[in-house]
A protein has these predicted regions:
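Short, glycine/serine-rich, charged loops/turns that create anion-binding
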Residues: 41-43, 74, 139-140
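Donor-binding and catalytic core of enzymes assembling or modifying cell-surface/extracellular glycoconjugates
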Residues: 52-137
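Mid-sequence helix-capping/hinge segment at a functional interface
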Residues: 1-46, 50, 198-206
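Glycine/Thr-rich phosphate-binding loops of Rossmann-like dinucleotide-binding domains
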Residues: 45, 77, 124, 142-143
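Nucleotide-sugar donor-binding patch of glycosyltransferase catalytic domains
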Residues: 94, 126-206
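A short acidic, often aromatic-flanked loop/helix-cap motif at beta-alpha or helix-coil junctions
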Residues: 20-21, 100-104, 157-163
Length: 207
């Protein structure tokens, strides 16, 4: 039935989510649009390069956004790449290695939005009802993607990696695979501004 949408049969995580007894207080930061991001992926060819994160941060700079960087301890080197290229970004909160796998679904549920490539955390975000921005790069989003409230950003001409035909090397560099246009950055900003939690943050700031 082509009339059905993701809202007719939403996916969900097993509830109640495991809530840690203690957790980083910054997850409760008030008056901010909390955006979770994954800067790396198991398949390193799916890792979004630093320049793309900088472009996203710059486009959202006039909004009260905080970027929460999730990841396993061995992903710190990717955060170091961003720091080497652009210095310490003031609204990037490094949670790499600080959230256990058991605590991850609940922690991601605290986000207002999640931005990443086709990696595990976008599916966790989707399962806990967090809107997703998928930077699909070389991955076929027609075949597999989060199915909830999702914004797709990328170029279909770059699609060449599939569920049963995964590739680890590509003729294009990652900067080309994940390139974002001005139009797609505008769509991203519009998507963020349309989130109910974002509107509350704007109201709190008097915007």
């Amino acid at each position: 039935d082509r009339a059905l949408t993701w809202q007719d049969s939403p996916k969900h995580a097993t509830k109640p989510l495991f809530k840690p007894a203690t957790y980083p207080a910054i997850l409760d930061k008030p008056g901010a649009v909390r955006i979770g991001i994954s800067i790396a992926a198991g398949n390193k060819a799916k890792t979004v390069p630093p320049v793309i994160w900088k472009q996203i941060a710059d486009r959202l700079a006039d909004l009260p956004c905080e970027f929460y960087v999730f990841g396993a301890p061995n992903e710190q080197s990717w955060m170091d790449d961003i720091t080497r290229a652009y210095g310490e970004l003031p609204n990037f909160i490094n949670l790499i290695g600080k959230i256990s796998l058991e605590e991850l679904p609940w922690s991601i549920s605290k986000m207002d939005c999640y931005i990443a490539s086709d990696s595990g955390n976008v599916y966790i975000a989707d399962a806990v009802g967090v809107p997703v921005v998928l930077l699909f790069g070389p991955c076929c989003h027609y075949e597999q993607r989060p199915l909830g409230n999702v914004l797709l950003i990328g170029n279909d001409d770059n699609i060449c990696s599939y569920v049963f035909e995964t590739r680890y090397y590509f003729p294009q560099g990652r900067e080309e695979l994940f390139a974002v246009t001005d139009e797609s950055l505008d769509e991203l900003k519009h998507f963020i501004c349309g989130l109910p939690t974002a509107k509350s943050a704007f109201d709190a700031q008097g915007n």
